[in-house]
Amino acid sequence: MASNSAAAPIWKIAAFAATLMVGLATLADGEEERTRKAMLAIGSEEFQESCAACHGTDASGRGELANKLLKPPKDLSRLAEQNGGTFPFWRVFDVIAGDTTIEGHDTSQMPLFSQRMRGQEAAGVFPPAPLRVLALTHYLESIQE
């Protein structure tokens, strides 16, 4: 895997800060389960909007556009299984954020959703992009088979 080393730490720091803010809010309010559900809901919504067309609504890699791609989309519901039983959280985060490319994967096929997210964030319409990438990564972690 190749990595854009300059951008990756910025995203990770922003994601850590977002996690810390969510965590502190959770501790302050004592509403851990509600916060977790909200984060997963944001991630699920982001997945359906940005990923399901290629990866399928169940993340199996069989979305409606899958057969139109040069390389079949990955089954995102089995990432932990394919990684020795451990979900590769930060690797997945980096791929979604566009900070890591996958060897042999034509990166032009997978749009950089983080760029779209940053534009929406700048317009003041959506939560910060790193938080949405983080929520999507947590969602993918939650659906592992």
Predicted regions mapped to residue ranges:
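Short, non-ligating residues that shape and space the ligands of small metal-coordination modules
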Residues: S60-G61
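Electrostatic cytochrome c docking/interface patches
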Residues: T26-E46, G84
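Extracytoplasmic electron-transfer domains, predominantly the class I c-type cytochrome c fold
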Residues: K68-P128, L136-L140
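Bacterial N-terminal signal peptides
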Residues: K12-G23
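Sequence context surrounding c-type heme c attachment/ligation sites in exported
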Residues: L40-A52, A123-P127, L131, Q144
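Thiol-/selenol-based redox modules, centered on thioredoxin-like
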Residues: V133-H138, E145
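N-terminal secretory signal peptides that target proteins for export/translocation
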Residues: M1-I10
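The canonical Cys-X-X-Cys-His
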Residues: G43, F47-T57, M110, L136, ...
